[in-house]
C-alpha cells in the first residue's frame, strides 16, 4: 500500500549552525504569508525542546529528521518550512523535501562534531553562499 500524506509542499532549509537558516525561514514565511499563502514552520531546536530530546548521536539525528517529516505530514498548510542542520544525506532524504535550500554562508559552525559530520549536499535547489 502506498503511503499517503498531505499535499503540502515541503521546503528544507539546511546548513551549518549559525549560517542563517532560521533567519531565512522566518523571512520566507513572512513573504509567503504576506502573499496569502498558508505556511507552517518547524524549527529543529524548538521541536527538540518540545520533546526534551537533545541527542546528537547518529541515531538521535536520524530520529529528529524522521520527526520533522512526520510533523510536516500533519500540516494542512500550502507550504511547510523546516529549518534544521541536516548534516547527513540520510537526514535530508528522510525529510522528502520538494525544495532544498542550502545556506552555505559559513565554512565552520559552532559545534565541532557537527562540522565533522556535515556532508555538503550534492543535490539542492538553491544555495545561499553568503549572509545578507
Which functions belong to the PLM regions below?
Residues 17:
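The conserved Walker
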Residues 2-8:
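Phosphate-binding P-loop
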Residues 58-111:
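Glycine-rich phosphate-binding loop used to anchor ATP phosphates in small-molecule kinases
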Residues 13:
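Hydrophobic anchor at the beta1->P-loop junction of P-loop NTPases
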Residues 21:
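Conserved lysine of the Walker
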Residues 93-94, 103-132:
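Small-molecule kinase domains that catalyze NTP-dependent phosphoryl transfer to phosphate-bearing small molecules
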Residues 25-70:
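Conserved substrate/cofactor phosphate-moiety recognition/catalytic segment
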Amino acid at each position: 500500500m502506498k503511503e499517503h500524506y498531505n499535499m503540502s509542499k515541503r521546503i528544507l532549509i539546511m546548513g551549518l549552525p549559525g549560517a542563517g537558516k532560521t533567519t531565512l525561514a522566518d523571512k520566507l514565511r513572512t513573504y509567503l504569508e504576506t502573499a496569502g499563502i498558508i505556511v507552517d514552520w518547524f524549527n529543529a531546536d524548538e521541536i527538540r525542546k518540545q520533546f526534551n530530546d537533545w541527542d546528537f548521536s547518529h541515531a538521535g539525528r536520524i530520529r529528529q529528521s524522521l520527526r520533522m517529516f512526520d510533523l510536516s505530514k500533519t500540516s494542512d498548510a500550502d507550504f511547510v518550512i523546516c529549518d534544521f542542520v541536516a548534516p547527513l544525506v540520510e537526514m535530508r532524504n528522510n525529510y522528502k523535501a520538494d525544495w532544498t535550500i542550502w545556506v552555505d554562508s559559513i565554512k565552520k559552525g559552532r559545534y565541532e562534531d557537527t562540522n565533522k559530520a556535515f556532508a555538503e549536499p550534492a543535490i539542492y535547489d538553491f544555495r545561499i553562499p553568503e549572509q545578507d
